[in-house]
């Protein structure tokens, strides 16, 4: 099966802190906005807060192995994890009506950026948010 680029939305991490380890050998890209959104939930005293804190710990373990902005192997047999910095985003690629001031739209700009950087690979937005998936599919 061909390797894919996966843009993982905040909603996925907040429901499964260990999701990074479930995407086989596909490469995972995290727009910096996802990290900011996860951080907003870490003080909650429920399952969402617990998942936010565990996600941050998982990312910190990977950060200790190398540069997240360059890409770090998640585990042997799994893909790379790379953070997409705000300065990399192709904001001019966002269609009319999508704003760089809306978190979901910045995450979608991350997907457009990765798609442009790796045109020969399929780029997929993974989200539990139905509207996010609908908008992402409309950008193809």
Annotate each predicted stretch with a short phrase.
Residues 4-124, 130-138:
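Active-site-proximal, substrate-binding regions of enzyme catalytic domains
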């Amino acid at each position: 099966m061909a390797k894919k680029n996966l843009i993982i939305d905040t909603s996925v991490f907040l429901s499964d802190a260990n999701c990074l380890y479930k995407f086989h050998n596909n490469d995972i890209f995290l727009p910096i906005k996802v990290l900011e959104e996860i951080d907003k939930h870490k003080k909650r005293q429920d399952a969402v807060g617990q998942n936010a804190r565990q996600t941050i710990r998982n990312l910190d373990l990977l950060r200790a192995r190398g540069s997240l902005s360059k890409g770090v192997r998640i585990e042997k047999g799994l893909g790379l994890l790379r953070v997409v910095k705000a300065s990399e985003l192709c904001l001019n690629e966002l269609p009319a009506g999508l704003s760089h001031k809306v978190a979901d739209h910045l995450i979608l700009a991350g997907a457009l950026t990765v798609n442009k950087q790796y045109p020969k690979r399929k780029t997929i937005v993974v989200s539990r948010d139905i509207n996010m998936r609908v908008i992402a599919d409309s950008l193809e």
